[in-house]
């Protein structure tokens, strides 16, 4: 490689051949590899030898440009200062402008690379930049463009070092803003926009910010002054500049005639470009844009329209220059929109009014309506500028831009101009029916020479840019604001775009104007896609038509049109037939729900539905932490507020009801409403309560969780008395969540309406009977009824009966626990009427009455068993209990509607909380019964503290459990008239269905003892 490089450099190559050789060396990276110091040294020696000779200086500069770009860092640092001096000598010499231009080109690359090296940049900024700027300012007029390029490079790479020459540089640049050479004017404007960043910015660039704000105010003031001189006497608006800026020191305009008007027009255009660059260029410090002053200037310029000027005298020249002035002011508006963005929304009404005002003012000029097809429309460049700014405004502010949404007049004008610019021209044939009598018949060759020409001169590129700009602006408006645009606008656009695209695909012989260009056809396809994606809510989207048209567009001869049609077709197809579920953010996994029999009717409240319930999306994203169905925190008293809604999936908190026996048996049943299966009957395994006692969960020190010992001490007492009632009932609760626990999955039975919203837990003890083997059956005899709730039960009877059908297989097993003697007693005693039977079918599991409803309780009858029958209407009355019902069935629980309230609790009752349930372990609440007619609503946080007031205990509480159960039917039995035959059948049916409600499939851990 070294030999090849040396051979190429030693040859005498022409400028073109040397350029090709340098391009090849750079492509191969010949000087970037390691171990090539000889090649780099050969390049540097060849470069220095050619720079010393004036005849080969161009070749030397070309090799120097290659060395600056390809040299490693150490070589660059070593030779950078010497290269800079060589370039400065070439700039100060009287070399041709071409050599000076090439030297400035190498200088720009050298300054850009050296500014990134701290040590080198410090030396150059201190010792070389001021002299370099002085040399550039002294170049002759033929080298103004290279000089300005070099000055701009110094401003960008070493702005701090250029601050000492700010005044001289400002005067030099202002003198060039009126230059007739457009290239000089553009570079001078670029340099002028960088003046505020020169010098030291002090703390946090405060000096830079002040310089920028002062300079932009000076530019605005100068624009007002120049416009006043240019169109004095033609303005109808009396607005003037009231800012803090001072006019720039331009040289005065000597000629008041045509030359003066042209000079003022060039100055106005240059100042507008300076303002645009001030707003668009990156600045090292935050600045404040004077939006009000800028918009006032824009409105003042736009208000001067062609109707204010005439085509005679000096005003004709001003009228010719007015489109250029308007285009310049539109560039300022576009730069302001880009710089400020949505902060301009308070001025949206003013900005939206500018577009139709400009389009309408230039469309009303005389003589522009008779332009034949195939010719460029007048003021097309100005209209393109309007559509470009419109697209920028809508893209920046979106649907808040207000385009085509404001006053009907302005929206209609804008839409009409857009449609006229995207509609292809048509040839109009004028037919005349007037025939002069006695006139000579014309020859065919003489007909239509002026009115009908099938072949005329046309420009195939005419109005292509205008049509493309209008389509882009319209696509942007429809895409961002299509859903709020009027229905009529959508209909008109559909009626225009769809037939036109079909004509284009069919290859119509008619000339279609700008749609010969592939850019216009592509934008027309894009308009149809935007109409499909953002339709009006009251108008159907052209989805199916779009699919057909896009399918035809895939065969377009233009590659960009076919590529876009393929993309649009894929979008439309996926709208109609999604292939797979879309990727979603990680969702919490719900706790597993127990299996429910398919034929069981449910009244379960709506749960959180997934986007694809049938087939969950197989996301590869990691799932979020699961939201527990039940709180895993230690149990808290009922007075503490309920868990937040997100822990119960947005539902209301549940109220748990537990049924504990004085003598825990392996077959005991614990029923909890803290389950998302609405009703869960869980068979508690043997030893579960013992485990929970050994591992009590923490609770607040003020309230001690009930223990089994307390229950055993209170167990000898009789059935709870009526003096004990539940606290004031809160609102009804919703359906329970999943009950997580160590035991097997609960077997769901009949669905229940949502329980009260916030209620305290209720623990009810039911004493066992004489025969322990029939312990489940004798507790069922008196758990259900209350005459005050029968109205609601009538409404819920049908739903509960449907829920009971799923447990038909339990009825046969439950019949085994009913003896013949019990059946005879049931036929003899008919104290339960039809309404009481309905009540038995609808009771909630947390409200347990003993026996059926009794109309009257004789004096002297023990009412201690009313503890478990307290409802929100007041203390219930005991119903007569037959002797045979004591051994009827096992534990029987029915689910009431959501209006039912919890029953009372006996003092000291309850067992320590097991892992199966998460109800707060609190002592039973003993409060007086609530009034029977006005149940006060009560939130969970308002529940009074747990107390055990001194209440009278019936004497029967001192008797043993067996004796209490034996005497119980005699004490509460009240003679009643025999029921009718229909009532007997209803009682039998109700007993059968109530029996189905109790027995459940055995637990996975341990089978319960069979009922006898």
Swiss-Prot record:
InterPro entries: ARM-like, ARM-type_fold, PELP1_middle, RIX1_N. Residues 586-651, 684-986 are annotated as: Disordered. One of its GO terms (molecular function) is chromatin binding. Expressed in oocyte. Signal peptide: none annotated. Residues 614-626, 634-646, 726-739, 920-935 have a biased composition (Pro residues). GO terms for biological process: cellular response to estrogen stimulus; positive regulation of transcription by RNA polymerase II; rRNA processing. GO terms for cellular component: cytoplasm; euchromatin; MLL1 complex; nucleus. SUPFAM superfamilies: ARM repeat. It comes from the Eukaryota. It is found in: Nucleus; Cytoplasm. A motif (LXXLL motif 4) lies at residues 129-133. Keywords: Activator, Cytoplasm, Nucleus, Repeat, Repressor, Transcription. A motif (LXXLL motif 9) lies at residues 524-528. The Glu-rich region mediates histones interaction. The Leu-Xaa-Xaa-Leu-Leu (LXXLL) motifs are required for the association with nuclear receptor ESR1. Component of some MLL1/MLL complex. Forms a signaling complex with SRC and estrogen receptors. Belongs to the RIX1/PELP1 family. This is Proline-, glutamic acid- and leucine-rich protein 1. It comes from Xenopus laevis (African clawed frog).
């Amino acid at each position: 490689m070294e030999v090849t490089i040396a051979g190429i450099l030693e040859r005498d190559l022409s400028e073109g051949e040397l350029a090709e050789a340098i391009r090849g060396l750079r492509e191969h990276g010949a000087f970037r590899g390691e171990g090539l110091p000889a090649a780099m040294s050969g390049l540097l020696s060849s470069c220095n030898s050619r720079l010393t000779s004036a005849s080969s200086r161009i070749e030397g500069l070309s090799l120097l440009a290659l060395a600056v770009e390809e040299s490693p860092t150490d070589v660059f640092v070593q030779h950078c200062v010497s290269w800079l001096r060589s370039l400065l000598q070439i700039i100060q010499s009287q070399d041709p402008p071409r050599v000076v231009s090439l030297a400035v080109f190498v200088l720009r690359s050298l300054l850009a690379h050296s500014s990134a090296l701290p040590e080198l940049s410090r030396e150059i900024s201190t010792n070389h930049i001021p002299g370099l700027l002085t040399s550039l300012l002294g170049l002759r007029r033929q080298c103004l463009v290279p000089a300005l390029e070099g000055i701009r490079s110094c401003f960008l790479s070493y702005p701090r070092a250029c601050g000492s020459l700010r005044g001289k540089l400002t005067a030099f640049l202002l003198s060039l803003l009126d230059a007739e050479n457009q290239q000089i004017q553009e570079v001078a404007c670029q340099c002028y926009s960088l003046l505020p960043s020169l010098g030291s910015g002090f703390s946090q660039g405060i000096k830079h910010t002040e310089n920028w704000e002062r300079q932009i105010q000076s530019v605005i003031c100068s624009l007002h002054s120049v416009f006043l001189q240019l169109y004095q006497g033609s303005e109808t608006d009396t607005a003037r500049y009231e800012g803090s800026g001072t006019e720039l020191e331009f040289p005065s305009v000597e000629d008041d005639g045509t030359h003066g008007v042209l000079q003022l027009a060039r100055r106005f255009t240059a100042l507008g470009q300076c303002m645009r660059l001030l707003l668009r260029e990156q600045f090292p410090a935050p600045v404040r844009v004077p939006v009000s002053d800028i918009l006032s200037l824009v409105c003042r310029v736009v208000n001067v329209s062609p109707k204010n000027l005439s085509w005679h005298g000096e005003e004709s020249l001003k009228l010719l220059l007015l489109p250029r002035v308007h285009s310049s002011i539109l560039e300022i508006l576009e730069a302001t929109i880009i710089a400020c963005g949505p902060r301009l929304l308070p001025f949206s009404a003013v900005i939206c009014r500018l577009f139709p005002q400009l389009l309408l003012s230039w469309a009303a000029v005389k003589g522009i309506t008779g332009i034949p097809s195939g010719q460029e429309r007048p003021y097309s460049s100005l209209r393109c500028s309007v559509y470009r700014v419109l697209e920028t405004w809508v893209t920046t502010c979106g649907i808040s831009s207000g385009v085509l949404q404001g006053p009907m007049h302005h929206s209609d004008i804008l839409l009409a101009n857009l449609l006229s610019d995207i509609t292809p021209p048509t040839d109009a044939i004028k037919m005349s029916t007037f025939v002069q009598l006695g006139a000579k018949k014309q020859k065919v060759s003489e007909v239509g020479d002026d009115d009908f020409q099938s072949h005329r001169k046309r420009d195939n590129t005419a109005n292509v840019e205008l049509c493309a700009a209008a389509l882009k602006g319209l696509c942007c408006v429809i895409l961002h604001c299509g859903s709020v645009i009027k229905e009529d606008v959508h209909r008109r656009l559909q009626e225009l775009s769809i037939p036109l695209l079909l004509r284009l695909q069919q290859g119509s012989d008619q000339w279609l104007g700008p749609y010969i260009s592939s850019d216009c056809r592509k934008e027309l396809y894009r308009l149809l896609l935007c109409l499909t994606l953002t339709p009006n809510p009251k108008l159907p989207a052209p989805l199916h038509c779009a699919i057909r048209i896009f399918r035809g567009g895939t065969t377009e001869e233009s590659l960009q049109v076919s590529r876009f049609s393929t993309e649009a077709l894929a979008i439309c197809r996926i709208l109609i037939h999604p292939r797979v579920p879309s990727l979603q953010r990680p969702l919490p996994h719900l706790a597993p729900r127990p299996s429910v029999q398919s034929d069981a009717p449910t009244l379960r409240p709506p749960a959180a539905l997934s986007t694809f319930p049938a087939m969950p999306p197989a996301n590869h994203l990691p799932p979020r932490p699961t939201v527990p169905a039940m709180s895993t925190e230690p149990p808290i008293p009922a007075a503490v507020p309920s868990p937040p809604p997100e822990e119960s999936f947005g539902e209301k908190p549940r109220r748990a009801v537990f049924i504990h026996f004085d003598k825990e048996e392996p077959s005991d049943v614990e029923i909890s409403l803290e389950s998302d299966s609405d009703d869960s009957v869980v068979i508690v395994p043997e030893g579960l309560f013992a485990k929970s006692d050994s591992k009590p969960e923490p609770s607040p020190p003020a309230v001690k969780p009930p223990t089994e010992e307390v229950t055993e001490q209170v167990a000898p007492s009789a059935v709870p008395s009526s003096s004990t009632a539940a606290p004031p009932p809160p609102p009804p609760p919703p359906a329970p969540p999943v009950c997580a626990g160590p035991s097997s999955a609960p077997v769901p039975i009949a669905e229940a309406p949502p329980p009260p919203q916030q209620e305290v837990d209720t623990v009810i003890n039911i004493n066992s009977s004489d025969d322990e083997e029939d312990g489940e059956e004798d507790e069922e005899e008196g758990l259900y009824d209350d005459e005050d709730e029968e109205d609601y039960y009538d409404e819920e009877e049908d739903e509960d009966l449907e829920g009971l059908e799923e447990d038909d297989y339990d009825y046969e097993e439950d019949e085994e626990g009913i003896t013949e003697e019990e059946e005879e007693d049931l036929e003899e005693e008919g104290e339960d009427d039809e309404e009481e039977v309905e009540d038995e079918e609808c009771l909630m599991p947390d409200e347990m009455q003993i026996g059926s409803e009794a109309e009257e309780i004789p004096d002297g009858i023990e009412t201690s068993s009313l503890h478990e029958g307290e409802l929100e209407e007041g203390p219930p009355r005991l119903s007569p209990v037959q002797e045979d019902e004591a051994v009827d069935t096992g534990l029987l629980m029915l689910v009431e509607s959501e209006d039912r309230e919890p029953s009372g609790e006996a003092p000291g009752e309850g067992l320590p909380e097991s892992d199966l349930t998460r109800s707060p372990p609190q002592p039973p609440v003993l409060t007086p019964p609530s009034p029977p007619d006005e149940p006060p609503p009560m939130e969970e946080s308002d529940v009074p503290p747990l107390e055990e007031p001194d209440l009278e205990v019936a004497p029967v509480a001192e008797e043993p459990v067996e004796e209490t159960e034996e005497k119980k039917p005699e004490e509460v039995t009240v003679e009643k008239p025999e029921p009718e035959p229909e009532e007997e059948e209803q009682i039998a049916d109700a007993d059968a269905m109530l029996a189905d409600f109790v027995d459940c499939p055995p637990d996975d851990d341990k089978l319960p003892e069979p009922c006898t």
